[in-house]
């Protein structure tokens, strides 16, 4: 048979050759297996790198509009403004028919200065004694130079006919041979804790404006005194908030004595209370004195320690926070992710508008059919988000899954504003209440001691509440230093 060896030697040679071929094949198979193993490792590494790149890209895209970052972190390249509410149809500028704010001439100026031309503009003759035919009025609003005045109180000692000497009592608050008065000290505290100048700069400003100024140490002592004088006002604010039906709560970092402390805020309507504590969580919230005794609806973000207060009637989660999270999904997710996130955004905003319209019309509830429709869209969006990100491969999917699951699990809290018109859609009021503490840090740096931070928060609570009641900060502080702090009515 052709090709078949005709002897044993030929068979052995062919067999040896086959063994060589089999060995080569086994070696190639081993190499391929090793390569497959390496490819699998490389694929895993590539997937991990792709996930990291996606996470980093999402981080780069984060700004104050789609995350919890403050607007100050946007830098010079601020994101283009976008309104989730869509176009209102209103043109920019002052609405037609609305009165303007042009300064008007007053009929009762404090001072009048008449300017007469000396000679005729045509023939050059003197105009002395000439008849006045017209008057053009122009007014300049300015402030006169203000210098501190020194008032000396002399307590006389009088001798009675019976031989007894009686000395007059000093006026209230006049306790030292030389001291600064309530308006000067009130102005100093206003510049320091009202306008956030540093303590030294506040003293320099007083000196330059009024010719007199306390030392930085004396101003610090005045702040300590003011915080003590404000105790009755702070007590009234606390009592009002504890008994309120709805209260906003928030917290933010506040660098103090080289460490991170936390400012906690509670506010509703015209009342604001800010406190400071070393802890952000339940300890700090408890020390503020509102949440442990509160029986109303607490409006806040999804920070878990708020949920540990079971004495409250209910929780309402901030709509602005969840909108920012959903906007981030629309900007970084897949087409399917964008769809469910946008659906949730539309449902939340539609319910917010319906709630606003109902309040404006004097109603107490949204139309049941409208409420049910948008609740359904919201619910379906959350369920879709959970299903699409069930694999949770990578941080982005984990975040989207967590967001959708939270929306589903806490539907009652996210939609409470639509079911109870007393509840606002956002927690912006609480953020506004603590914004001044961040502004203070930006302008004049951190607080040097926890005691100083506590004094700052006490004064800010007083000033913020006074401002919401139409009371000027300077007047409120002056009254406090006169021993008559303004106390809000809570009835």
Show the residue positions of the predicted features.
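Short, flexible loop/hinge motifs at secondary-structure junctions
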Residues: 1-179, 249, 300
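Catalytic center-proximal scaffold of phosphoryl-transfer enzymes
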Residues: 2, 23, 54, 95, ...
């Amino acid at each position: 048979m052709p090709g078949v060896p005709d002897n044993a030697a030929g068979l052995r040679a062919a067999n040896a050759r086959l063994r060589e071929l089999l060995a080569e094949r086994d070696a190639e198979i081993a190499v391929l297996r090793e390569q497959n193993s390496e490819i699998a490792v490389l694929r895993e590494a590539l997937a991990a790198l792709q996930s990291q790149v996606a996470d980093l890209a999402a981080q780069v895209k984060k700004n104050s509009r789609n995350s919890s970052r403050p607007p100050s972190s946007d830098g010079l390249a601020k994101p283009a403004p976008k309104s989730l509410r869509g176009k209102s149809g209103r043109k920019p500028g002052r609405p037609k028919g609305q009165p303007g704010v042009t300064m008007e001439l007053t009929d009762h100026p404090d001072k009048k200065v008449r300017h007469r031309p000396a000679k005729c503009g045509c023939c050059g003759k003197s105009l002395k004694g000439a008849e006045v035919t017209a008057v053009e009025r122009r007014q300049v609003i300015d402030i006169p130079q203000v210098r501190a005045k020194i008032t000396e109180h002399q307590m006389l000692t009088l001798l009675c006919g019976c031989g007894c000497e009686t000395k007059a009592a000093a006026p209230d608050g006049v306790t030292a041979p030389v001291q600064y008065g309530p308006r000067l000290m009130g102005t100093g505290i206003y510049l320091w804790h009202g306008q956030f100048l540093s303590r030294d700069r506040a003293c320099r400003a007083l000196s330059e404006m009024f010719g007199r100024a306390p030392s930085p140490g004396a101003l610090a002592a005045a702040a300590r005194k003011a915080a003590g004088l404000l105790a009755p006002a702070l007590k009234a604010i606390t009592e009002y908030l504890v008994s309120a039906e709805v209260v906003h709560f928030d917290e933010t970092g506040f660098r103090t004595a080289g460490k991170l402390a936390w400012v906690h805020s509670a506010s509703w309507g015209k009342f604001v209370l800010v406190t400071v504590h070393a802890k952000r969580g339940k300890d700090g919230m408890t020390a503020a004195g509102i949440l442990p005794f509160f029986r109303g609806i607490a409006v806040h973000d999804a920070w878990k320690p708020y949920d540990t207060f079971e004495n409250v009637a209910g929780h309402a989660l901030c709509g602005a926070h969840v909108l920012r999270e959903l906007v981030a999904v629309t900007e970084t997710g897949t087409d399917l992710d964008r769809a469910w996130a946008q659906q949730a955004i539309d449902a939340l905003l539609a319910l917010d508008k319906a709630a606003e319209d109902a309040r404006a019309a004097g109603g107490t509830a949204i139309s049941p059919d409208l409420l049910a429709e948008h609740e359904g869209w919201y619910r379906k969006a959350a369920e879709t988000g959970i299903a699409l990100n069930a694999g949770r491969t990578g941080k982005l999917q984990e975040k989207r899954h967590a967001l959708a699951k939270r929306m589903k699990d806490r539907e009652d809290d996210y939609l409470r504003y639509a079911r109870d018109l007393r509840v606002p859609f956002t927690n912006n009021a609480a953020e506004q209440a603590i914004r001044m503490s961040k502004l203070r840090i930006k302008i004049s740096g951190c607080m040097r001691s926890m005691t100083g931070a506590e004094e700052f928060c006490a004064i800010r609570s007083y000033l913020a509440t006074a401002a919401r009641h139409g009371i000027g900060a300077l007047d409120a502080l002056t009254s406090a230093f006169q021993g008559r702090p303004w106390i809000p009515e809570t009835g």
